[in-house]
């Protein structure tokens, strides 16, 4: 059976960043605990799951505080080309777009995500020069305990 490739393109949730108690704390979950790795184990050996998570990544926004390198749109095409052929791209972005400094509504953020989807659909980074399929994911509610 041919291997299939899933690209997980996201922010700190995809990266596996542990919730920070202080701005200087930068811990990461063990690779086996990160959601792309868990998904890869569940899918089985015929799937290659690639985690492309970057803490603070926005959908399409240059961050005036953290830098323009946090803009997911700027990084997307190079990452798609790096991992071709891709069967499925999972987008898990938008959380950092909620920062007060951006002043975006949920509708605004959905339009930002749409720009990423269109960029993927217009790419030739899937099988046989086609576009990969796209799945939009959102993190579940997190309840902090302890």
Put a short name on every predicted segment.
Residues 1-2, 33, 45, 69-146:
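Alpha-helical cap/lid subdomain in secreted, periplasmic
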Residues 1-54, 60, 78-81, 89:
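Serine-esterase "nucleophile elbow" of acetyl-processing enzymes
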Residues 15-18, 58-61, 98-100, 143-146:
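Short acidic/His/Gly/Ser-rich catalytic and metal-binding motifs that mark active-site loops
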Residues 21-28, 64-68, 104-107:
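Short glycine-enriched, charge-decorated loop/helix-capping segments at active-site entrances
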Residues 53-56, 136-138:
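A general secondary-structure junction signal
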């Amino acid at each position: 059976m041919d291997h299939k490739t899933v690209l997980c393109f996201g922010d700190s949730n995809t990266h596996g960043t542990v919730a920070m108690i202080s701005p200087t704390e930068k811990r990461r979950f063990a690779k086996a605990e990160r959601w792309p790795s868990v998904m890869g184990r569940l899918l089985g050996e015929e799937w290659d799951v690639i985690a492309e998570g970057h803490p603070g990544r926005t959908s399409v926004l240059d961050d005036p505080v953290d830098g323009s390198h946090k803009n997911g749109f700027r990084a997307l095409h190079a990452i798609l080309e790096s991992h071709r052929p891709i069967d499925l791209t999972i987008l898990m972005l938008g959380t950092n777009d909620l920062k007060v400094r951006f002043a975006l509504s949920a509708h605004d953020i959905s339009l930002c995500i749409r720009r990423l989807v269109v960029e993927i659909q217009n790419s030739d980074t899937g099988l046989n020069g086609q576009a990969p399929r796209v799945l939009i994911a959102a993190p579940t509610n997190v309840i902090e305990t302890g």
